[in-house]
From Swiss-Prot:
Protein's UniProt name: Homeobox protein Hox-A6
Lineage of the species this protein comes from: Eukaryota, Metazoa, Chordata, Craniata, Vertebrata
CDD domains with a match to the protein in the record: homeodomain
Bias-annotated ranges (Acidic residues): 219-229
Pfam families (UniProt xref): Homeodomain
Localization terms from the record: Nucleus
Cystine pairs: none
Family: Belongs to the Antp homeobox family.
Keyword Membrane found: no
């Protein structure tokens, strides 16, 4: 087995009086050195390898730089939007490009806002332009303020329960105090105005009925008197 390392047990003789120089060279060093561990005949090959390894190292360094550069470009493309790549670029026109992209984005969003505004205005116009027919009006609402087609307030309709309770109250009291009117309005889910108007109308109806009764009674009495004579 051949070895390129120097064996300390065997003396080594070099031509041209290099023995004294060989004794000064340490056999085992702390670092790796091809010139110290290889014979002189392999010095040229070692130099060639060393010279060949330098471009390899240079290529490796280039590859490392290329990898770093590629990762930097990839990071820039990932973490920055397209409009911000111009600001990341080393050229001085990046700021202007970023501003141009910013203004272009504003101009791009303005038509959308205008379209939404137009659509909302059209929806409001349609909402207000919807015709209201008489059959669509609610007349039985307690707080209704809907007027009829001739500008008059629509007639209030009462439920059967409300009419029955109001008739009972009118049978006992033809005139209500304000306190009693408020109590009835809260009990029947009506307003004071509606209670007041109903009692006014009911009194007018009662007077007409009494007037008719009085006239019929007087007429009947006159007829009896005439027959008695």
């Amino acid at each position: 087995m051949s070895s390129y390392f120097v064996n300390p047990t065997f003396p080594v003789s070099l031509p041209s009086g290099q023995d004294s120089f060989l004794g000064q060279i340490p056999l085992y060093t702390t670092g790796y050195d091809a010139l110290r561990h290889f014979p002189a005949s392999y010095g040229a090959a070692t130099l060639q390898d060393k010279s060949y390894s330098s471009p390899c190292y240079y290529q490796q360094s280039n590859s490392v730089i290329a990898c770093n550069r590629a990762s930097y470009d990839y990071g820039a493309s990932c973490f920055y939007p397209e409009k911000d790549l111009a600001s990341v670029s080393p050229s001085g026109s990046g700021k202007h490009r970023a501003q141009d992209d910013f203004f272009s984005s504003d101009q791009h969003y303005k038509p959308d806002c205008a379209q939404n505004k137009i659509l909302s205005e059209e929806g409001n116009d349609r909402k207000y332009s919807t015709p209201i027919y008489p059959w669509m009006q609610r007349m039985n609402s307690s707080s209704s303020s809907v007027f009829g087609p001739h500008g008059r307030r629509g007639r209030q309709t009462y439920t059967r329960f409300q009419t029955l309770e109001l008739e009972k109250e009118f049978h006992f009291n033809r005139y209500l105090t304000r306190r009693r009117r408020i109590e009835i309005a809260n009990a029947l889910c009506l307003t004071e105005r509606q209670i007041k108007i109903w009692f006014q109308n009911r009194r007018m109806k009662w007077k007409k009925e009494n007037k008719l009764l009085n006239t019929t009674e007087s007429n009947s009495e006159e007829a009896e008197d005439k027959t008695g004579e």
